[in-house]
Curated annotation (Swiss-Prot):
Domain GST N-terminal: 1-82
SMART domains, A to Z: EF1G (SM01183)
Domain EF-1-gamma C-terminal: 258-418
Subunit structure comment from the entry: EF-1 is composed of four subunits: alpha, beta, delta, and gamma.
InterPro entries tied to this protein: EF-1-gamma_plant, EF1B_G_C, EF1B_G_C_sf, Glutathione-S-Trfase_C-like, Glutathione-S-Trfase_C_sf, Glutathione_S-Trfase, Glutathione_S-Trfase_N, GST_C
Physiological role: Probably plays a role in anchoring the complex to other cellular components.
Key words, A-Z: Elongation factor, Protein biosynthesis
Name under which the protein is recorded: Elongation factor 1-gamma 1
Compositionally biased intervals (Basic and acidic residues): 221-246
Source species, domain of life: Eukaryota
Molecular-function GO term, any one: translation elongation factor activity
Start and end residues of each GST C-terminal domain: 87-213
Region described as Disordered: spans on this chain: 211-265
Length: 418
């Protein structure tokens, strides 16, 4: 009998087992036509879990409920699974972080979110306490992640899977960028995890909440209406001439979308799309054609060049994780594609790998909306390029060209944002 998971779409508690299955090579099928509130109320379902909780895993040995137990079962289905670490102490630390994730992160997120969604009574004082407790928990997690890429060891474990799935509810539903910016290492960790192929296959593209949900107010109960006494009809008056009816107010026309401040800058002689086409279409003599063309086009009054250096290179001990981290950064920069061009280099033949970049932005400074919206910006040191300095100018050319070796070291990867 195959493993069958009963759940609804988008259930972060089901994600735990499904991601563990992807890492473990264990086949888990989803129950067909599952409908929350219907399927989990049937006699057959209630035999597996008398209180009808979701998810449930059907196994050859009987049903398993509670999401962490299900994820553990799936992980244990593969012998010597690295998701459980390689030593007794690693196993203990994995269990430690799974418990922390449930009691500190998930529980406090729920105490903040569920009353706002109408699933529990909303009490302002209780909400303040829940937020304070969640910040305390995220602060502890942030401290741990300041010097660790993963929760335990040097690769993904079940602790990372459970923690990321529990963080997902907060990031996706209630924890806005303004809230999570206090915890930059938690942000980096979360976005790195959800962009791993096995996570992404299950979770899809993850977006952060734009706002905190409004408190759901219950509609007031309708007042009982007393039966009205029959009124005696008054003699009808002669009909008066109708006054001109007041026309209903016209719907307000939708306001035009405010222009991006960068669109209001004085015109530049540099046409960014022309440079991007030149970059993409130059296959030979890159230095003579593309690099020379770039400097011929470059307008220091309309654009600015910036070097960036990752602040936490000591954490870059795994090549694919480092490259995925850079890939996630470029995905989140998509909001400024119209106004920017970038090159990101992963440097070194052995860990820890260095991450450096070059960015061309419209305007004399890094756009404010990029600094506000893309959390990765805080993870880099940014230095404005002085093109009057020939050494800096040559460094720009080398980064655009992916020149190897770069500053005496091999290039592990080079990514272009265009």
């Amino acid at each position: 009998m195959a493993l069958v998971l009963h759940t609804f779409d988008g259930n972060k508690n089901a994600f735990k087992a499904l991601i563990a299955a992807e890492y473990s090579g264990v086949k888990v099928e989803l129950a067909k036509n599952f409908q929350m509130g219907v399927s989990n109320k049937t006699p057959e379902y209630l035999k597996m879990n008398p209180i009808g909780k979701v998810p449930i895993l059907e196994t050859p040995d009987g049903p398993v409920f509670e999401s962490n137990a299900i994820a553990r079962y799936v992980t244990r289905s593969k012998s010597d699974n690295p998701l459980y670490g390689s030593s007794l102490i690693e196993y203990a630390h994995i269990e430690q972080w799974i418990d922390f994730s449930a009691t500190e992160v998930d529980a406090n997120t729920g105490k903040w979110l569920f009353p706002r969604l109408g699933f529990a009574p909303y009490v302002a004082v209780s909400e303040e306490a829940a937020i304070a407790a969640l910040k305390r928990s995220l602060g502890a997690l942030n401290t741990h992640l300041a010097s660790n890429t993963y929760l335990v060891g040097h690769s993904v474990t079940l602790a990372d899977i459970v923690m990321t799935c529990n963080l997902y509810m907060g990031f996706a539903r209630i924890m806005t960028k303004n809230f999570t910016s206090e915890f930059p290492h938690v942000e980096r960790y979360f976005w790195t995890m959800v962009n791993q192929p096995n996570f992404k296959k299950v979770m899809g593209d993850v977006k952060q909440a734009d706002s905190v949900p409004q408190v759901q107010k219950k509609a007031a109960a309708p007042k009982e209406q007393k039966p009205k006494e029959a009124k005696k009809e008054a003699p009808k008056e002669a009909p008066k001439p109708k006054a001109a009816e007041k026309p209903e107010e016209e719907e307000e026309a939708p306001k035009p979308k405010p222009k991006n401040p960068l669109d209001l800058l004085p015109p530049s002689k540099m046409i960014l799309d022309e440079w991007k086409r030149l970059y993409s279409n130059t296959k030979t003599n890159f230095r003579e054609v593309a690099i020379k063309g770039f400097w011929d086009m470059y307008d220091p009054e309309g654009y600015s060049l910036w070097f960036c250096d990752y602040k936490y290179n000591d954490e870059n001990t795994v090549s694919f994780v480092t490259m995925n981290k850079v890939g996630g950064f470029l995905q989140r920069m998509d909001l400024c594609r119209k106004y920017a061009f970038g090159k990101m280099l992963v440097i070194g033949s052995e860990p820890p790998f260095k991450v450096k970049g070059l960015w061309l932005f419209r305007g004399p400074e890094i756009p404010k909306f990029v600094m506000d919206e893309v959390y990765d910006m805080e993870l880099y040191e940014w230095t404005k390029v002085d093109i009057s300095d020939e050494a800096q100018k040559e460094r720009v050319s080398a980064m655009i060209e992916d020149l190897e070796p770069f500053e005496g070291e091999a290039l592990l990867d080079a990514k272009c944002f265009k």
